[in-house]
Amino acid sequence: MRRWSVHLCAFVVATALGGAPVVRAADMTKTLRVAFSTAENGFDPQAAYDSYSFYVIGGIFDPLYAYDYFARPVRLVPNTAAALPEVTDQGRTYTIKVRPGIYFAADPAFKGKRRELTALDYVYSLKRIFDPKVRSYWVYIFEGNLVGLDEVLASARKAGTFDYDAELAGLRALDRFTLQIRFRRPNFGFEYWLASNQFSAVAREVVEAYRDSSNRVMENPVGTGAYKLKQWTRGQRILLEANPDYREVVYPSPGAGSDAADAAIARGLAGRKLPLVGNVDISIIEEAQPRLLSFDSGQLDYVALPAALAPNVLDGAAVKPEYAKRGVVVHRHVTPSIAFFYFNLDHPLVGGYTPEKVALRRAVSMGYDRGEAISNLLHGQAIPASQPVPPALYGHDPKYVAPYGYDPRAARALLDKFGYKDRDGDGYRELPDGKPLTLVLASTTDNTARANDELWKRCMDALGLRITFLKNKWPELNKMSEAGQLMMWGLSWISSVPDGNDYYSYFVSRNIGTLNDARMRLPAFDALYDKSRDLPHGPARTKLFDEMNDMIYGYAPWILANYPYENVLAQPWLKGYKQNPFVQHQWRYYDVEPRPH
């Protein structure tokens, strides 16, 4: 979820150009069957924020770039761009050629005409990120650096509207198929953002035909991608069908950077026109057990194995014999994501920056048993988190040592020191001024969340802290979180790009209401973050990251929990599947053979 939410999140669909002659187009008699654990929010690339919406967006829309399907470490390749970006002026200017001959899916908004993709579509789409009505999460990527943007943003925020026709010096179409993006300072690694689905192209005609009061188009997605939306029952089912206007793209042959096993994955598929399967049928199945049962009965072609059910399926890193006998395989890696709990620093009970408030948050953090959560709730399908940046991303420091971890004795001593004591003898502490102290943790309604609630209750009881739980579905809790209405909540962020700088944007004050759920306001942290954005990956930037890590532990806006494994179970009839750390659900590359009856 967006944050998984999600950070946000890449969710791009990679492409390959060239290769063997095209054999045949999508087989409309074939259906790929998939399940999501959480309901989607909507399918507007610039307005979406949760992982599950972006999975669908990745099938319908196109960013300029993608990742080579097979190469590891990941490598950028052109998608709708004609070539990799020309980067000049010491990383300040990106010039990109859009490939001619790419068309949007047919839609009444185009009034019967074929609509070609142009550089202006990317200019318009990126401008939507800056529209205050859209309330896009992604403005922080540009704010303070894109040439001319800060003045435009200030004017738009004051007026409440955005002038899409006004000149923006840092974002221009030089001609019909040439896009130029200019920054005030070097923007190292920006090319990876150009492979993110939030930077996909939408057509202005579609937005103006279907937009809501927020200038969002969540329900009428029209893109240039491999699929188009056929049917949507919100929170229950999403049906996609192959886009007949999709350009000539074929399944790639493994090349440089591919694994030895990739030849077998591509066998019989290389050179075939994408997408391979004509239909994608997505069900929303929130509970873990029914999802696994659907997979076991052959109703799903692949499924992300819920950690709570890992003992039923896995023996270490391999599937158990009964699954192996059926031909089921597991694809496994540590995801570029972090699970955490946050405190709302605006909340009168747990928020604030005074010593006693910081002490309360630190004590709660030291009292939550992450090890038990990983062992008993996640059944070992995660590793402890030491810093916001997950392993395998640029910026993760394996030498960084967390200042504190699970230590209930130290937590109780800290609470005692700052006056959190049980004054009425009921077994629970009060605030230093004697007023009641009750922690309220937001929590979803599924069985996994209930098990975590029980762990939280045991841990807080051991500290003498009363805790209750606010139960609701994820989309509703997310809205409340954005509005600053929750005291505490647990989330995950998954990376859109292979660079870790983004993980510190979740603590920057200007991102309150979008990325910064903790609503932290520390000018010193903001300054370190802005300084880090001007540096390439290397020791100097890592030193700044470690300073920010120390501040995060010092003020305790988050309880850093874990970096989860992703275990994807695949049926023997699913072909062409290759796991990617930054791209999930690359449906156009998947094929299904006839299922056994």
Language-model features and meaning:
Residues 1-4:
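Positively charged n-region of N-terminal signal peptides that target proteins for export
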Residues 26, 69-70, 85, 93, ...:
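Extracytoplasmic/periplasmic ligand-capture domains
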Residues 35-89, 222:
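N-terminal lobe/hinge region of extracytoplasmic solute-binding protein
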